[in-house]
């Protein structure tokens, strides 16, 4: 009986660990996508600012 309980406990720990790793990975991907989107937006804005500067002759 004790062996079965230990095995069940190990399986439960493994499932919890896998779930935690999955959640961590999902959160990291979401943060990476948000940061990537912000960087892309900044690049677009910088490009627009440079274009406007060139149009009005600042650079």
UniProtKB/Swiss-Prot annotation:
The keyword Membrane applies. It is a single-pass membrane protein. The chain crosses the membrane at residues 7-27. It is found in: Membrane. Keywords: Membrane, Transmembrane, Transmembrane helix. One of its GO terms (cellular component) is membrane. This is Uncharacterized protein PAE0586/PAE2015. It comes from Pyrobaculum aerophilum (strain ATCC 51768 / DSM 7523 / JCM 9630 / CIP 104966 / NBRC 100827 / IM2).
């Amino acid at each position: 009986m004790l062996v079965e309980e230990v095995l069940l406990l190990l399986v439960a720990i493994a499932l919890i660990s896998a779930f935690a790793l999955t959640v961590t990975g999902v959160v990291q991907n979401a943060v990476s996508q948000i940061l990537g989107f912000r960087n892309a937006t900044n690049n677009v804005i910088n490009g627009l600012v440079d274009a406007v500067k060139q149009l009005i002759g600042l650079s």
